[in-house]
Amino acid sequence: MIERGVEKPALLKADLHIHTRYSMDCDTPLEKIISRCRELGINCIAVADHGTAEGALEMQRIAPFKVIVAEEILTTHGEIMGMFLKETIPSGITPREAVMRIRAQGGLVNIP
């Protein structure tokens, strides 16, 4: 039962692993991603480029929907994804160091 005056929470239709032209394996411009998300009704994305959070930070500035800043960090033992980041975490560090740096930013550790 919905109480009068209590707003119903909005539903999110999300894609939680998107790459942009900032990633080594993608050349899709940010504007094209925004356009496609609108077509599909997606209102939340996590931009997780390889080795950088810059694409996610830029997308967060221009997108008309929720953008989670993420990054795929190449560690000495494979990739770890950090979500809800504030800045880029460098590649080539140990998994332990990556986890510590993600948590230091208040982020969520995700093993893809």
Segment roles from a protein language model:
Residues 105, 111-112:
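Active-site-proximal loop/helix segments of hydrolase catalytic cores
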Residues 2-105:
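A metal-dependent hydrolase metal-coordination microenvironment
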